[in-house]
Amino acid sequence: MHVVTLRDPSSPLVAQFVPEAGMIGTSLRDDGVELLGQRRGLDAYVSEGKTMGIPILYPWANRLGDNTYTAQDVTVTLTPGENGVRADPNGLPIHGVLAAYPGWRVTDETDSGLTAEVDFGADPRLLASFPFPHVLTVAVRLADRTLTVRTTVTATGDRAVPMCFGFHPYLQLPDAPRADWVIETPPLRHLGLDDKGLPTGGSEPQPAREEALRDKAFDDAYDQVAEGAVFAVSGGGRRIEVHFEQGYPAAQIFAPPP
């Protein structure tokens, strides 16, 4: 597989993406220090959909409440194991249908930028799971010590395209023990979840917070994320920020047990 390496012109920051493995970001290194969690690696992502690095979860992030969904007056029945659908331990469709999808087409590549697209209307397997013809474009750029990911969805049919996707960056600070990491979150609304990880309808406001991670674990859902909101993790003299610049009103904070 062709790995595209991007270099920041103004710093030792280097990023790598693999378009033919789902346009996944596999590495973000600062002067050789890896800042993305590698987990089981690219091979497990390609063969089993086990996430690592920065995968795109599309056309839905997280899990659906059933194997049937309705959007834009269209009802779709999904079958885990078919047409890109993967199931969580409870049998619910999770993280969309593009895990390791090989059909991305690179439309632009420079030393510090990469753009690739998927035409949903051209692939019957994708349309079987998400029957809304459109072109999905992801553009990444590395500059000024910032990796920017911009996503564009352009409808190519008569139906509007439902939006429920996201990215799943796995961040790490190799210079500090996990227990010493400090996480910062903006003001949010915390959503109640049941034992399957599905929203219950309950919620409560959560003010901006800063706390040591220690031995805590999270898999929590939030909405009312303001445009420009900043999430951060710091430790060992290093700080990584994630900026929700535009178009992402919801978030999931995930920190598996140590």
Stretches found by the model and what they are:
Residues Y248-P258:
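A C-terminal functional module that forms or caps the active site or interfaces directly
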Residues E34-K50, L78-G103, A116, D180-E204:
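Glycine-rich, pocket-lining loop/helix-strand segments that form or immediately flank
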Residues L6-D8, P19, L28, F120-P174:
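Acidic, contiguous internal or C-terminal segments within carbohydrate-active enzymes
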Residues S11, G22, R63, L98-Y101, ...:
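Residues that act as N-cap/strand-start positions at coil-to-secondary-structure junctions
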Residues R86-D144:
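Extended, loop-rich substrate-binding clefts of extracytoplasmic carbohydrate-active enzymes
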Residues T70-V74, V106-L114, R141-T146, D175-A179, ...:
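A short, structured loop/turn motif at beta-sheet edges
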Residues A160-P162, Y170-Y248:
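Active-site/ligand-binding surface loops and adjacent short beta/alpha elements
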Residues M1-N83, A229-P249:
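Beta-strand-rich N-terminal accessory domains
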